[in-house]
Amino acid sequence: MIDYSGTVALVTGAASGIGKALAQALHARGARVMLADVNEAGVKSTAATIPGAHAIACDLANPSAPGALVEQAFGWQGRLDLICSNAGVGGSRKLIEQPIDDAANRLFAVNVFAALRIVQAYLPMLERTGARGRLMMTGSENSLSVPSAVKGSAIGLYGATKHALLVMAEWLRHELRSAPIDLHVLMPGAVYTPLVARALPDPSKAPPQLGLIMPERCAEIALRGMDLGLFYIPTHAHLADDMRPRSEGVAQALDALGLRPKG
């Protein structure tokens, strides 16, 4: 189990939902937490629930914001042991109708490129100070597949960003295998965040197949996954089943093309 006593953690997307729960869980384990979110009132509200927390309002879609945030977080206490790169935005347009506009570009800017810019700022800091760090990116069940629970919804571009985030994290894991940083990818299924609450005000009425969990449970799984040193941190058992159609489809195509040895 990781000893967070005296450590400093930065949590982005901390105004609500998973980010807020991660910040509270890390504080409960002994960490000092810096919170960041584009929602200034929300992130200050979260900070008010955590003794000693520091809140920053920033828009990670701004190319200079991720690096500046990492520097500010390090300067706060002179160390930065963990970053939970959790900030993300959603979308609700069918891909066939999705214009490549500012909203589409913002999806990739926040969900993918901000996470990369955070790593690019964090690693040199660790190398400069001789410290070892830890970084967890928040992906999604949509990082792995088109989950059964969301088929028919209009979140295709969001799903594409979460696929991209996972592949990027896997490449970083390979590139940084000798670097002083431990990487993790949290892949939540259905979590009762404010975004979900707008469509489903009463969580007790969620369809059982959705497997809806509270943000606090998601944070508990996330910290347990880091304790265990896991790179992939899924929150729902169905994620493995959701991946099966893709792998089976590729296997069937190889058979049809005669590209797999028989027997």
Label each PLM-derived region with a short phrase.
Residues 185, 201, 205-242:
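C-terminal helical subdomain
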Residues 40-41, 56-68, 101:
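The beta1-alpha1 cofactor-binding region of Rossmann-like NAD(H)/NADP(H)-dependent oxidoreductases
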Residues 67, 90-105, 148-151:
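Conserved mid-core segment of classical short-chain dehydrogenase/reductases
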Residues 136-164, 169-170, 174-177, 190:
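Catalytic loop of short-chain dehydrogenase/reductase
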Residues 29-45:
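Conserved glycine-rich Rossmann-like NAD(P)H-binding loop of the short-chain dehydrogenase/reductase
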Residues 2-34:
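Canonical Rossmann dinucleotide-binding motif of NAD(H)/NADP(H)-dependent dehydrogenases/reductases
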Residues 7, 79-80, 126-141, 178-181:
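Active-site loop of short-chain dehydrogenase/reductase
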